[in-house]
Every structure is written in structure tokens, then in C-alpha cells.
Design a protein with these regions (language model features):
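Non-catalytic, solvent-exposed segments at the cell envelope interface
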Residues: 4-193
């Protein structure tokens, strides 16, 4: 019975995934990869994770990516390696030779352009991607029960204004914090932090 409910939950979540119907990741193979590199990548699943600064819950182009993580999964043993790409990393964004911050690739052309730029500049082949916004992060942290963070006085000075903005952007309820020091943050408070 537990397995049935678990499978049902996973299917419900999968049905909530927003995908661009005009973008097929399999069309974004990296033509620049050497044959030996392609052979070395067999048995691995490479996923680009994009965290967008979206206040209207949109996930497509027009949003800057504040978080870019490349996750590489060894399918034989389940080992996962993560690499964070700094949003201000200056890379070649498209075929016309335009260089800019990598977070601009997603803003200009959504996941398609971001994946193409990452593949080309980092000599990788991204097999899949996921995009998440503030609400998804807040909901995930709430599901996990929150997080404990030590807030300095300087951080406390600003955080409540960001909490208000995050509540308005996500529609997820939260409360202002009362003091600096150790605080147990809910999802919205953690996103604001």
C-alpha cells in the first residue's frame, strides 16, 4: 500500500513539471565533443539544474538564473557529483560569438540556450534539466522541516524585508523573525536569507 501511494505521489509531481513543448533536449547534442570524451561519458547522466529569479512563477526565458548546478550521476553506483557554475561566469552564449554572463543565456533563450552554452563552453553533454523558482525551494525546505541558521545582526537587519517580498512572490505564508542569533527558518525565511 505504501509503494502504491509513493508511486502515485511521484506521478502527481511529475505531471506538475512545466516543459517547453518546442524544446527537446535530445536535439541539443554537443557537436564539439571529441569521440573519446563521448565514450568516457557512457554510463553517466548529466543534469543541469537552474534556479530562476522568478517572482511570477514562470520558468522560461526572460528569467535570470541565480543558481546553475551541473549534477553528474554515475548510473552504475549511484554516485553523484555536483558543480556550481557562478552566475557571473563570462561565457560564449550563442553561435554568433556573443559573450556575457551565463545567467543571461537562460534569460535570452530559456533552457535551450543555457544548455547549448554550457555544453559548448564546458565540453559536456547535458542529458536533462530541471528549473526551479523561489516557491519550489520554499516548499522543499518546508517539506524537510526547515533549517537552522545563525543570523548576524547585519543579516537580521535586512531579512524581514526580504521575507515580505518572498511571501508576496510565492504565496507561501511565513512570519518575520524576532532577533539575530540562532533561528529555525521555514522555507520562505530560508529563501529570503
Amino acid at each position: 500500500l505504501l509503494i502504491i501511494f509513493g508511486a502515485r505521489y511521484v506521478l502527481q509531481q511529475a505531471n506538475r513539471i512545466q516543459r517547453d513543448p518546442n524544446f527537446k533536449i535530445e536535439d541539443e547534442t554537443n557537436p564539439y565533443l571529441a569521440i573519446d570524451k563521448v565514450e568516457n561519458m557512457q554510463g553517466y547522466w548529466t543534469v543541469a539544474l537552474f534556479g530562476v529569479d522568478s517572482r511570477d512563477n514562470s520558468l522560461g526565458k526572460g528569467n535570470n538564473t541565480d543558481v546553475i548546478i551541473i549534477a553528474n550521476v554515475n548510473q552504475a553506483n549511484g554516485e553523484i557529483k555536483l558543480v556550481s557554475i557562478f552566475r557571473d561566469t563570462y561565457l560564449n552564449l550563442d553561435d554568433d560569438g556573443t559573450y556575457n554572463k551565463i545567467n543571461q543565456a537562460y534569460a535570452r533563450g530559456g533552457p535551450k540556450q543555457a544548455i547549448k552554452a554550457l555544453n559548448k563552453n564546458l565540453d559536456i553533454q547535458i542529458d536533462d534539466y530541471a528549473t526551479f523558482n523561489w516557491k519550489a525551494v520554499a516548499d522543499s525546505i518546508n517539506i524537510l522541516g526547515g533549517v537552522d541558521i545563525e543570523l548576524s545582526k547585519a543579516e537580521f537587519y535586512y531579512i524581514n524585508a526580504y521575507i515580505t517580498e518572498t511571501v508576496e512572490a510565492t504565496g507561501v505564508a511565513s512570519q518575520h523573525l524576532k532577533s539575530a542569533g540562532m533561528n529555525h527558518l521555514d522555507g520562505v525565511q530560508a529563501v529570503a536569507y
